[in-house]
Amino acid sequence: MSQLTHINAAGEAHMVDVSTKQESVREARAQAFVVMLPQTLQMIIDGSHHKGDVFATARIAGIQAAKRTWELIPLCHPLLLSKVEVTLVAEPAHHRVRIESLCRLSGKTGVEMEALTAASVAALTIYDMCKAVQKDIVIEQCRLLSKSGGKSGDFQAVAND
């Protein structure tokens, strides 16, 4: 098993020095699901929510969150992202919204945290916009789907839904 990269020899948290790493194209995809009552989901699909377009707001929130991950999570590097995409799909058969994010850059460190932050904040935004009509909405399965680039190699999650 690999060592924790954010812990130094003295056991203290520190920001990893990436200055000697080679730049490469790095990409990560993450997902989250927001599970709700059928009528809450239908309100989103119909566009009848009094706060406006839930998907558009969640998409923008996710993109903005990816760009600000370094401000939210200690020890993350500020990154010059070249692409952030947040896709939201209503899945009425499962009473949920599937959120998938994609982050890409050419740089010295990965974008997994940015992809996870984008999916998480998009999910939180859906909850925030819908909590007035349903308080027991569930955010679940927030996870990394894949990553590519960098010396640690590629990763692909096992499908579970």
From Swiss-Prot:
Listed GO MF terms: cyclic pyranopterin monophosphate synthase activity; GTP 3',8'-cyclase activity
Annotated TM spans: none
UniProt pathway: Cofactor biosynthesis; molybdopterin biosynthesis
Subunit structure: Homohexamer; trimer of dimers.
Pfam families tied to this protein: MoaC
UniProt-recorded name of the protein: Cyclic pyranopterin monophosphate synthase
GO biological process: Mo-molybdopterin cofactor biosynthetic process
Keywords assigned by UniProt, alphabetized: Lyase, Molybdenum cofactor biosynthesis
Protein's UniProt keywords contain Lyase: yes
The keyword Ligase appears for this protein: no
CDD domains assigned to the protein according to its UniProt record, in alphabetical order: MoaC_PE (cd01420)
Protein origin, superkingdom: Bacteria
Family, similarity comment: Belongs to the MoaC family.
Residue positions binding substrate: 75-77, 113-114
Encoding gene (name): moaC
Catalysed conversion reaction: (8S)-3',8-cyclo-7,8-dihydroguanosine 5'-triphosphate = cyclic pyranopterin phosphate + diphosphate
